[in-house]
Regions:
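Cytosolic Rossmann-like ligand/nucleotide-binding regulatory domains
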Residues: 17-83
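Flexible, Lys/Arg-rich cytosolic regulatory linkers and terminal tails that connect or flank
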Residues: 1-25
Length: 83
């Protein structure tokens, strides 16, 4: 579920917040092994009401709220990781 998307007009980029559903592709591998599209950065997440810094060794879990920065043209590809 995309909770919120903001367009950074002058940067041709988007910031999106996703709520991670059970079974989402993004929950199956460490961040570093997901093969996220170039130009994508996971800026952080909220797990159980607490902010968490994300590293390549982070494993995202269902129910996490994840903030993603990406080029505007990549948002549809990113959404597939959260479905």
């Amino acid at each position: 579920d995309v909770s919120n998307v903001k367009c950074l007009t002058f940067a041709n980029a988007d910031v999106a917040e996703f709520t991670v559903p059970a079974g989402a592709k993004i929950t199956k591998h460490f961040i570093k092994d997901l093969g996220l599209p170039k130009g994508t950065t996971i800026g952080g997440m909220i797990r159980n009401g607490e902010g968490v810094l994300v590293t390549g060794d982070t494993l995202i879990q269902p129910g996490d709220h994840v903030v993603v920065f990406c080029l505007s043209m990549m948002i549809k590809k990113i959404e597939k990781f959260f479905n």
